[in-house]
From Swiss-Prot:
It comes from Salmo salar. CDD domains: TRAPPC2L. The keyword Transport applies. Transmembrane segments: none annotated. This is Trafficking protein particle complex subunit 2-like protein. The gene is trappc2l. One of its GO terms (biological process) is endoplasmic reticulum to Golgi vesicle-mediated transport. It holds the Pfam family Sedlin_N. May play a role in vesicular transport from endoplasmic reticulum to Golgi. It comes from the Eukaryota. The lineage of its organism: Eukaryota, Metazoa, Chordata, Craniata, Vertebrata.
Length: 139
């Protein structure tokens, strides 16, 4: 499904980023970083419209020739970015939402860990295995 999953802190530095294949990691760092401008733009546009009923799922941030970049923002302004392969046309919007819900729930579990310092990079085996389940298997 996903080729890159990233968790970005409120201050826009990566808390977690994972991509397959590993050779493209720098390319995906760039893709995730450039998507943050679109995320900020959507947050400010939605914030002006309805501050109370803000949708956490931002939808498709932007498509590229090879990938589609989707975004999600938590109430604490932590951003999740999922990059999927454009050739995967069977992937529906509700499946992307489901992936973000799983990611958010797993992130909440990490935050509830008393040994995790908020703002540190995420180094949880449970979080990593959940992300691995969402990633496409490199063949």
């Amino acid at each position: 499904m996903a080729v890159c999953i990233a968790v970005i802190a409120k201050e826009n530095y990566p808390l977690y980023i994972r991509s397959v294949p590993v050779q493209n990691e720098l390319k995906f760092h760039y893709t995730v970083h450039t998507s943050l401008d679109v995320v900020e733009e959507k947050i400010s546009a939605v914030g002006k419209a309805m501050a109370d009923q803000r949708e956490l799922y931002l939808g498709l941030l932007y498509p590229t020739e090879d990938y589609k970049v989707y975004g999600y923002v938590t109430n604490s302004k932590v951003k999740f970015v999922i990059v999927v392969d454009s050739s995967n046309t069977s992937l529906r919007d509700n499946e992307i939402r489901s992936m973000f819900r799983k990611l958010h729930n797993s992130f909440t579990d990490v935050m509830c860990n008393p040994f995790y310092n908020p703002g540190d990079t995420i180094q949880s085996k449970a979080f990593d295995s959940m992300v691995s389940a969402m990633m496409v298997q490199a063949s």
